[in-house]
Amino acid sequence: MIIVSRAIVLHNTAYNDSYSIAHLFSRESGRVSYLIPRSSKRGKSGGSLRLLISPLNELEITAEHKQHRDLHFIKEAKLCSLHGRIQSDPVRNSIALFLAEFLYLILRLPEADTNLYDFVAFSIDKLEEMDGPMANFHLAFLFRLLVPLGLIPDLQFGGSVIPRWFDPADGRFVPNAPAHGRGIPPHQSTYLQLFRRITFDNMKAFRLSRAERRQVLDYLVDYYRFHLPPFPLLKTPDILSTLFD
């Protein structure tokens, strides 16, 4: 079956001497894996395709999908838009690598989800186009991503003035520390109340130190880890932590 779809590059891994495997998130088919020629000797189109397989590149692809196969072939591909600033700017590129790694871990199903795809594509365009401080971009992305994933926590105190713990497993505030030992203590759970309002447009108003920003990120990732297991350790947050004061 031939499919035509927009698709976002998540990850590329070595497969054998002839091919690598590109993992893409497509608008029409969800997560799909494609064999990508590793050498231009396999034809001009193979060499051109290899150059397009870069994290968060959005492509328009024509691909051949065969039933009962996990690996497919891309017949044609072209960039939907040029993200030159993401490629050339170290800060944007580091954020892009984090987003790509995160999405690679959580987007696992070969099922179309157009709302989720459109949010991710919109976010990539924002990363390319925005000017000014970018330190909170990844936090805004992770908070907003909860909406299309259907993982929105209950961040209301329910009228209580008593400081409460946040239980990431249940996605709500609770009066005592959760038994699993990974609850967010009352003096830090206020971050969640604050950040539930964050967007790409207002994220510059959220002023955090490097340590506070990393703490919020760790709490967010742990929330995802509870709700989308299995969830291995991320490699890219340490890079982000060195970029922003």
Curated annotation (Swiss-Prot):
GO terms for cellular component: bacterial nucleoid. One of its GO terms (biological process) is DNA recombination. InterPro entries: ARFGAP/RecO, DNA_rep/recomb_RecO_N, NA-bd_OB-fold, RecO, RecO_C. It comes from the Bacteria. Keywords: DNA damage, DNA recombination, DNA repair. PANTHER family: DNA REPAIR PROTEIN RECO. Belongs to the RecO family. Involved in DNA repair and RecF pathway recombination. This is DNA repair protein RecO. It comes from Porphyromonas gingivalis (strain ATCC 33277 / DSM 20709 / CIP 103683 / JCM 12257 / NCTC 11834 / 2561).
